[in-house]
């Protein structure tokens, strides 16, 4: 299973924010600069992360973005659930004539659930804790 770039960059943005000192604000421009992604794409990603409570956005002169809750409370599996369309196959009877007897959808759904269950073993904090090589790459001190 390959994650969409939307989810990929959502995770990267969260990792960047988690690598900052607790509560420190950053900007969408800073995140886009670090990862080399378009500002327009990142705005959409941050809006989605904000809608689901993973990011807090503050407007104004001293505004910016930061994690919506502590990094140790953000499960990687939950992020993927919030960002990723998890339907692997299109099983409508209009599309596929074997749908009434097909077992593939159930198998694929079980695989997705196993994938998410494994991701639930890790938090955003696990991605950044004691990871000085990451801090250097992100230019975070």
Curated annotation (Swiss-Prot):
Q: Return the annotated DNA-binding positions.
A: 28-51
Classify the source by domain of life: Bacteria
For this protein, the record's InterPro entries field holds:
TR_Rrf2-type_CS, Tscrpt_reg_Rrf2, Tscrpt_rep_HTH_NsrR, WH-like_DNA-bd_sf, WH_DNA-bd_sf
Tell me the ranges covered by the HTH rrf2-type domain, including all copies.
2-129
Could you say which residues bind [2Fe-2S] cluster here?
91, 96, 102
Q: Which cofactor does it need?
A: [2Fe-2S] cluster
A Gene Ontology biological process annotation? Answer: regulation of DNA-templated transcription
List the GO molecular function terms.
2 iron, 2 sulfur cluster binding; DNA-binding transcription factor activity; double-stranded DNA binding; iron ion binding
The UniProt entry, under Pfam families, shows: Rrf2
Q: How is the cofactor bound?
A: Binds 1 [2Fe-2S] cluster per subunit.
**Record's GO cellular component terms:** cytosol
Q: Which UniProt keywords apply?
A: 2Fe-2S, DNA-binding, Iron, Iron-sulfur, Metal-binding, Repressor, Transcription, Transcription regulation
Function, as annotated: Nitric oxide-sensitive repressor of genes involved in protecting the cell against nitrosative stress. May require iron for activity.
Question: What name does UniProt use for this protein?
Answer: HTH-type transcriptional repressor NsrR
Q: Which organism is it from?
A: Yersinia pestis
Q: State the encoding gene.
A: nsrR
